[in-house]
């Protein structure tokens, strides 16, 4: 029995009989499946696997969620993921951390394209440094995975799959948010550029984000609950296809952040 399947198409099976000395050619015309696409994940066992066949449960966060929730960073998008808790800690710096299975953020491994680039410390402060415009999808696995992804993957794993160039395109956006009409603003500027050669052998995806958030004092005690934040991120994802089955990839990520608690106003008298 010969079985053929592809992402976005219905599977087909056909019984064939092989005879010695003869070449058999079978042609398949797959029907597109518009009802449900069988997603492919890589975090479960470090190889591309159909989501329903993965040995562990993998939750996927798509760019559509970031758009619908107006999320500009990874930390804002993970808030809407079931089984994952994103909390803001430290009154001084206001960093964000991901809690999976009740454990601190340092026990969750942050991956970029299945590689443990972030240390346990950077995984705590880096959630707000990863812009949504570089993310193709986010795969979240709850439970230990130290044998596959490193010693920090005790509570779970968050794998960020970055976007690859598909066609020539570009986008620019600027968003301004205000906190309860207090005069504190969150400005976010994002830029994307995708370039692909005519023969599809070479391509490059460039992204950038600049964010400036004013300090915000919610209760008027003179000390900001949300610290002042300046964030700049720029990156590149390029490839060169050497053959139909192999390619050379180049990635560059630069992230810079400054945050500080400010004394917004004089303290109120007791």
Where are the regions that the model predicts?
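Short, acidic, small-residue-rich periplasmic hinge/interaction motif at the N-terminus
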Residues: 3-10, 19-67, 105
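Short, polar/charged loop or turn motifs at beta-strand boundaries
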Residues: 56-74, 97-103, 113, 178-180
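Extracytoplasmic beta-strand/coil segments of soluble accessory domains associated
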Residues: 75-119, 136
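Non-catalytic regulatory/gating segments with a bias toward low-complexity or hydrophobic composition
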Residues: 78, 138-139, 158-160
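Membrane-embedded beta-strand positions in outer-membrane beta-barrel channels/transporters
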Residues: 97, 137, 157, 190-192, ...
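Short acidic/polar hinge/loop motifs at secondary-structure boundaries
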Residues: 97-99, 115-142, 163
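Residues that define the transmembrane beta-barrel architecture of outer-membrane proteins
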Residues: 152-154, 185-189, 228-232
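Periplasmic-side early beta-strands and strand-to-turn transitions of outer-membrane beta-barrels
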Residues: 167-177, 181, 192-269
